[in-house]
Structures are given as structure tokens and as C-alpha cells.
Amino acid sequence: MRINILSEDTSNKIAAGEVVERPFSVVKELVENSIDAGAKTINIEIENGGRTLIKVLDDGYGIDKDDIEKAFMPHATSKISKLQDIYSINTLGFRGEALPSIASVSKTTLKSRTKENEFGREISISGGSVDYIKDCGTNIGTHIEVRDLFYNVPAREKFLKSTAKEASSISDIVNRLALAHSEISFRLINNGKRVITTYATDNLIDTIRAIYGKKICDNVISFERHTDLVSVHGYVGNAEISRGSRNNQSIFINKRYIKNKLITAAVENAVKSFMMINKFPFFIIFLDIFPEFVDVNVHPTKSEVKFQNERDIFKIIFDTVHEGIRNSLKESFKVEALKEEEDKLFDIKEDVITKNEIKHDDKIDGYIKKDSFPVPVQIPIDLKRPIENYDNSTKENKDRSFDDFREKDIIKETSQEKETYDIITNKKAKFPELRVIGQFNNTYILAESFEELYIIDQHAAHEKILFEKYREDIKNKGVSSQILITPSVVELLPEDFIYYDENKEVFKNAGFVIEYFGDNTVAIKEVPLFLGKPLVKDLFLEIIDNLKNMGSGETSEVKYRSIATAACKSAVKAYHELTHDEMKTLIQDLRFAEDPFNCPHGRPTIVRLTVTDFEKKFKRIQ
């Protein structure tokens, strides 16, 4: 087969296939050109989903009349002049491919004038061939019309979606561009009807309200952080506006709209602790980073980027979003009485019982205590030898299950000791001290404070307490393990084994002792003590799946969170009757948790109802 040299017309149409996928691609390229030209107002008009007309008008710098024809030549650009420039790009466009690609598959007319010229210049191109160039009267800025897109490439036109879907895609990209550039006024008209209007503002929340409406605006949480590497800011939605898809997620790098799995994973992992599973959060995130640390020259449409410091970027985003949500939850549970309670904590009575005075046969049913002293409370079993079927093998506990043993033989602590320990650890209560009223349906604890009723999900609350305890133990490398009498042998798929092998140290620090058994098979010999009697194989595979979904770039801290989340299944269950003291202790532990308001899986742990809420329900007030 002989090698042929393609004609300029053919090569331009092939190149157009990379840049001009659909009508929304044309809108994106033209609007980005307007933004690069310093426009303050951009008007877009489309007809029939952009098939028959795409019109973009701006009030930017305009194109010099002597450069009008050059603008439609391949690789002609005003934004870079040498190869090194692509590594420090500050503009949205730079390759000089958009206009020639668009003009090669449509009928295009462009008018433009700069402030230095009294008259503008107009050029018309059909299918890549120049029809005419002439002087014209026009305002400062650029006015471009693209008609009959793909008229000369029927194969491409055939694969366009319905008019409504193409119009929706255009609306979506204009929304993203408006979010990225709230300092610019945007207007989109579809078949003569105005569908998007934003006004120039220095307040992003105003643009969010204009695009998404009041409900979205009222349910977003702001976050912001500045580091030497990157500045991060934006908004993330609460559970009220989470969706079943990622359509309402927007990522901007130096104001360029992109899609990036690393950033998406960082935000979603940060939100995961506060939101129900099977939902995706609404978020708008901006990253400002030095151009030399990010490569946008990865994809023809510049929709993907690569970072030099992926792990650092992930951690900064994760921490920033997580802290923003946590602070918002704290604000919603702000209590005036906390200061008074803090003062009471330091009024320690002399008759506080010491650790040595507590009898080990004191019992608390159904609930694992959080650390009551600097030394972790341990179940009194011999870790030097295996545990037959996880049961204590002594005669005294012969007829008792491990779960009963774990739940009933934990050291009892007094409220005075709890206060002393909180002083030692310098932990602050996140909600007021509550008076326990009782238990509803053996699942929810009812408690009150002042004129407020608190409803606590006992399982979700205990999960969060265990989660934070386990995570802290991992951080301090203080996880206690229990030996399995019969190691659990797990045969992994090759892909799963790769993820295990990559994270061996993570498993080790989390309290798992695992040995290689040959041929992608491992033997799990020890598991974290607090798990009780877990289904070892199922838990291990669940953790592997979580790590796979996270990818390989995430930090160990995030991986430990994932393991802790999967491991917290030993929490007290729903429909389990608790004593009054157990309920008090659970609430007290939850008060001093770092993030007490959501379980590790995102469900709320506590709901607050005020007297006003009840009076509205009973129609006492409107």
C-alpha cells in the first residue's frame, strides 16, 4: 500500500474532528477566545441546537484588521510564540486550531475591530475557503457567526444528538464558563428565548444563584485554603442537593473548566463522611496553581490536565473540603451554654475515683467505651495465643460469646473521670450536655437540653465513636490485634493483589497481620481487636474494593479512613436495649468526638428539634 499525502482540506477536516466534536465544542472555543480577549460582556445565540447558527458577540480587544485572515490559518495564534510558552500558559486557548477547524466544517463570518482602528474588517469562509474580506462598520470587539455546522461532513452531522440535547450541552458549557468568570456578564439565547443571564460580579455566590437557583445557593458550604503550592476555594453542597450523577460538579484549574479524576476523588472522599452513599455531591472548586506545575497540553480540547505533585494536591483538596464541611456542621450546632460547661470541667472534685480504684468486674452492657484514660482499655485476654473461634477459652467464660464478653466486661467509668480525661486531652464538646429522657424503639436515644430535643441514632453514633478511636490508634500506631486460631486464606484476582501489595504497609498499621501465601493468595493471621468477630474475608475484600475505587494516588491518611469506615461494623446495633447509664455514656463520648454529627457512611447521628419546631407542628404558631 502506497503512502499518500493528504490535501490541506482533508487534513483540516480531520483536525476539526479533534477540536470540533459537536456544537457545544464550537461555543466553548469561541467563548474562550472572547474571554482571552478581555471581554466584559459575552452574548451567545444559537438556533436548532447550534446546527444552523452559533453566534458569539463580545466587547473584547478585537482583532487587528491586518490579522483577520491570519486568524483562520492553522496554528496561528497571538498567545504563544515558542515551545517553552506552552509550559506556562495563562490563556484558555493557545494552539491556534479552533478558528481554522471550525471554518473548515461550516460557513463562518467574522467581524472585528480594535480601538485603534476606525473601521473593522469582515471575513467570510465556507468549508475552509475564503469567500471575501472587506472593511465594515462594527463595534469594538468581535462578532462571529457559524452557520450550517458539518454541512460538508455529512458523516459527522449524522452522529449529532437531538436538537434538545445539543442545546442542553451548550447551556451546560456556558454555565461552567460563567462560573469560572463571574467578572463577565453572559447571556445565552436559544431559538430567540433567553435561557441564561448572569451579571458581572466579584461574588461567586451571586453567579451560582443566577445559574442554579435559590435552593442550591442556600445549601452550599464554602471552603478556602492557600498554600505555597496551590490555592483552593469553592463551594460544596450538603446532602439536601446531592444527586445520583456527577452532572453538577465543576472543576476549574486557573479558571479553565476541566475534568479530573484526582480532584473529583479528593472532594468525594472528603464529603463521604457527611453524606449518604450512592449519591454524588454538588461542588464547584477552583484551583489556582503556577502554570509550570500543571500541564494542560494533554488533550486536544484541553479538558484534561496533569499535575506534578498529585499526592500533595489530593491531600490539600481533601483537607480543605473536609474542614469546610466540619466547620459548617459545628456552626449549625453552636450552643451558648458550652462556655459555662467548659468552666465546670475545671472544677474537679477531690473525691474523683482513680483508675486503680475501679473494679474490673464492674460492667456496662452493650457498649464499648471510648478511651477513658491515656492508656487504652483492653479486653483482658491473652494475645500471645490464638483464640478458638474468637471465644475466650477460660472456664469462666466458656458459655459466653465473644460479643457478650466484649460488651459486658469493659471497665466502668464515672462522669467525673470522663471530665478529667477530656481536660487531659483538651477536647471540647461539640453540643451541650444532654439529659437522657429514654430510648425509642430500642434504636433512638431521646435527650433534652434547654428548649431543644435531641434524637440520637445509637448505631450511627457508636459507629462514629469507634471510627474516630480506631483512626486515632492507627495514627499513633497503637492498634491492638487479635490472633486468629485459623488464618483466613484469601485468593485474590491479579488486579486485587496489586492493590493489596501496594498497600501492605497501610494494612499493617491498621492492625492486620497478613502473609503472602503464593499465587496471588494471602493468609490473614491477625485482625484489629476491636472488630470482635468479623467476617474476615468479606471485610478484607471490601477494603480492597474501597482502595481500588480510590486509585493509587491517594494519601495513606485517606486510605486509613476507608479502612476505618469499613471496619466499624461492631458498633451497637439498632433494636438493642440500652441502660440509662449506657445512653448517658454514649452521648457523652459523642459530644467530644471530632466530627460527631455524621457516621462514617454519611448518615446523621443526631437530629435537633426546637420548641418552635413542635409548636409549628401542633399549629400553635405559623
Swiss-Prot record:
| Keyword Metal-binding listed | no
Which positions, given as ranges, span the membrane? none
Q: Name one GO biological process term.
A: mismatch repair
Could you name the Gene Ontology cellular component terms for this entry? mismatch repair complex
Q: Which UniProt keywords apply?
A: DNA damage, DNA repair
Superkingdom of the source species: Bacteria
Which GO molecular function annotations are given, in alphabetical order?
Answer: ATP binding; ATP hydrolysis activity; ATP-dependent DNA damage sensor activity; mismatched DNA binding
Query: Which family is this sequence assigned to?
Result: Belongs to the DNA mismatch repair MutL/HexB family.
Main role? This protein is involved in the repair of mismatches in DNA. It is required for dam-dependent methyl-directed DNA mismatch repair. May act as a 'molecular matchmaker', a protein that promotes the formation of a stable complex between two or more DNA-binding proteins in an ATP-dependent manner without itself being part of a final effector complex.
What HAMAP family does the annotation carry? DNA_mis_repair
Instruction: State the name under which the record lists this protein.
Output: DNA mismatch repair protein MutL
Q: Which organism is it from?
A: Clostridium acetobutylicum (strain ATCC 824 / DSM 792 / JCM 1419 / IAM 19013 / LMG 5710 / NBRC 13948 / NRRL B-527 / VKM B-1787 / 2291 / W)
